[in-house]
């Protein structure tokens, strides 16, 4: 999985830097961007909503390394190809699945509106169990892309 690599010595998570350095790599120069979530923990992550006149996207700063991202990407593609409704990583202009900026990895997916799972709601629990069963069933033959982190279990 190829990456776009940019290195700067300033705050990579500022909206200005996201708009100036990250969005153009996805041909989103004229988009607006807003921060939705930020967690400043050991596994720092952030979520941005990117909007154009016709589409909305989710730009995520992920906390894992390239090999783990490759495993996650492998799993997402496997689930998608087995008819599970998962977001797909949108490639950059150079067909990369992520962008590396200030040693941070960013991915872009379509924006998906939805409700947070309410574990007190029997309908939500039933749907979650059905989906988990489908994931379990199609994952039996899963194999990750070469070069990704090997996970067992």
Per-region residue spans from a language model:
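Conserved structural core of kinase catalytic domains
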Residues: 93-127
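Short amphipathic alpha-helical patches
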Residues: 46, 99-103, 132
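Conserved NTP-binding catalytic cores of kinases and kinase-like/nucleotidyltransferase enzymes
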Residues: 1-91
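Generic hydrophobic, aliphatic-rich segments that mediate packing or membrane embedding
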Residues: 71-75, 85, 104-105, 124, ...
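Mid-sequence acidic-hydrophobic segments that form the walls
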Residues: 82, 92, 108-115, 131-142
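A cross-family kinase active-site recognition segment
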Residues: 122-153
């Amino acid at each position: 999985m190829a990456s776009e690599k940019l290195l700067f010595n300033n705050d990579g998570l500022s909206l200005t830097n996201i708009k100036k350095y990250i969005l153009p790599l996805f041909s989103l120069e004229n988009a607006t961007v807003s921060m939705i979530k930020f967690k400043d923990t050991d596994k720092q992550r952030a979520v941005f909503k990117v909007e154009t006149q016709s589409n909305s996207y989710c730009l995520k700063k992920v906390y894992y390394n390239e090999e783990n991202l490759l495993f996650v990407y492998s799993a997402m593609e496997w689930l998608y190809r087995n008819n599970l409704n998962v977001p797909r990583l949108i490639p950059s202009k150079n067909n990369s699945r992520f962008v590396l900026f200030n040693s941070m990895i960013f991915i872009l997916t379509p924006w998906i509106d939805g409700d947070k799972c309410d574990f007190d709601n029997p309908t939500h629990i039933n749907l979650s169990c059905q989906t988990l069963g489908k994931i379990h069933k199609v994952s039996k033959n899963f194999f990750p892309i070469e070069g990704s982190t090997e996970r067992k279990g």
